[in-house]
Amino acid sequence: MQNKPSSYDREDLLASSRGELFGPNGPQLPAPNMLMMDRIPLMSETEGAFGKGKVIAELDITPDLWFFDCHFPGDPVMPGCLGLDAMWQLVGFFLGWIGGEGKGRALGVGEVKFTGQVLPTAKKVTYEIDFKRVINRKLVMGLADGRVLVDGKEIYVAKDLKVGLFQDTSAF
């Protein structure tokens, strides 16, 4: 993909969920409700804590988001696993952005720490992904560290997020 955009809006992300952004063999983002971001203001192959790539994405928080009604009734909070999944989504999106093909699958995470929460009163969640290693050969895989911020305050940190792209997932 020559002259790749360095940012994406909601319509672009929805196109990715339909398989229209990175071509017929590229990875897809999930569709709403599991699409956990509204925009990606930064995509870079050279920035980041390790100089191997950086992604910043944002999710606007409103009290009517689907997960607040069910997690938990009377004590609404965004499930931490959705923030973790968003970070995996962004690692896979980056792999498609650099030209990787296949179906994205989360392969693991080394360590996750939760030190805060996303409440319905929040305004914005920001995800920051710093790539440590990217393999784009027969095997397509990304290894990254990530963090989640709510209204500018760090609340989750993930080390060694791992995502791979697979041509065949039947034996996965």
UniProtKB/Swiss-Prot annotation:
Q: Which GO terms describe its biological process?
A: unsaturated fatty acid biosynthetic process
Q: What interactions and quaternary structure are annotated?
A: Homodimer.
Please state which protein family the record places this protein in.
Answer: Belongs to the thioester dehydratase family. FabA subfamily.
Function field: Necessary for the introduction of cis unsaturation into fatty acids. Catalyzes the dehydration of (3R)-3-hydroxydecanoyl-ACP to E-(2)-decenoyl-ACP and then its isomerization to Z-(3)-decenoyl-ACP. Can catalyze the dehydratase reaction for beta-hydroxyacyl-ACPs with saturated chain lengths up to 16:0, being most active on intermediate chain length.
Q: What is its EC number?
A: 4.2.1.59, 5.3.3.14
Q: What is this protein called?
A: 3-hydroxydecanoyl-[acyl-carrier-protein] dehydratase
Source taxon at top rank: Bacteria
Active site residues of this protein: 71
Keyword Protease in the entry? The reply is no
Q: Look up the record and name the pathway of this protein.
A: Lipid metabolism; fatty acid biosynthesis
Q: Where in the cell is it found?
A: Cytoplasm
Gene Ontology molecular-function annotations: (3R)-hydroxyacyl-[acyl-carrier-protein] dehydratase activity; trans-2-decenoyl-acyl-carrier-protein isomerase activity
Record the organism: Aliivibrio fischeri (strain ATCC 700601 / ES114)
Q: Name one GO cellular component term.
A: cytoplasm
Assigned keywords, A-Z = Cytoplasm, Fatty acid biosynthesis, Fatty acid metabolism, Isomerase, Lipid biosynthesis, Lipid metabolism, Lyase
Output the InterPro entries linked to this UniProt entry.
FabA (IPR010083), FabA_FabZ (IPR013114), HotDog_dom_sf (IPR029069)
| Lineage of source species | Bacteria, Pseudomonadati, Pseudomonadota, Gammaproteobacteria, Vibrionales
Q: Catalytic activity, per the record?
A: a (3R)-hydroxyacyl-[ACP] = a (2E)-enoyl-[ACP] + H2O; (3R)-hydroxydecanoyl-[ACP] = (2E)-decenoyl-[ACP] + H2O; (2E)-decenoyl-[ACP] = (3Z)-decenoyl-[ACP]
